[in-house]
A protein has these predicted regions:
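Short, solvent-exposed amphipathic helices
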Residues: 59-73, 84
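A short LG(V/I)-centered, amphipathic sequence patch enriched
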Residues: 39-56
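Core residues of bacterial helix-turn-helix
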Residues: 23-24, 35, 42, 63
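The N-cap/first-turn positions of alpha helices
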Residues: 1-5, 28, 60
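Residue-level detection of the helix-turn-helix DNA-binding "recognition helix"
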Residues: 18, 36-43, 75
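Interdomain hinge and pocket-entrance segments immediately C-terminal to HTH DNA-binding domains
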Residues: 83-91
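Short helix-boundary/capping micro-motifs
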Residues: 9-27
Length: 91
C-alpha cells in the first residue's frame, strides 16, 4: 500500500492531523507536509482546514472514495495471492 494514501486516509478517519500522526507513529508536521505535497501534486486541497473537526473538500471526497476502492482491490489481490500460496504449500 502506498504510504501517502494510508496517511491521507488516516487523517480523514480521525478528522485530525494530530490524532492521525499519533496513530501512524510519525510527527504531525511530517504528516502535514506529506499531505500538502499530495495536494500540491493534484492541484487541489483534500481537507478544509478552516473547520473543526477537519472536513473533506469535494475533491477530497472523490479522493477518499477512490482510495477505498483501491484498498478493496489490494485486499482482493492479497487474498488471491494468499490462496495461491496455501494451495502451493498444500500440494
Amino acid at each position: 500500500m502506498f504510504t501517502w494514501k494510508k496517511y491521507i486516509y488516516e487523517v480523514y478517519r480521525e478528522k485530525s492531523f494530530s490524532k492521525a500522526a499519533q496513530n501512524l507513529y510519525i510527527s504531525q508536521p511530517s504528516l502535514s507536509a506529506r499531505v500538502k505535497k499530495v495536494e500540491k501534486e493534484i492541484g487541489f486541497p483534500l481537507f478544509d482546514r478552516s473547520t473543526s473537526p477537519l472536513q473533506l473538500t469535494e475533491v477530497g471526497e472523490v479522493y477518499i472514495k477512490a482510495a477505498e476502492e483501491i484498498f478493496q482491490i489490494e485486499q482482493r489481490v492479497e487474498n488471491y495471492i494468499n490462496n495461491l500460496t496455501t494451495l502451493k504449500t498444500g500440494s
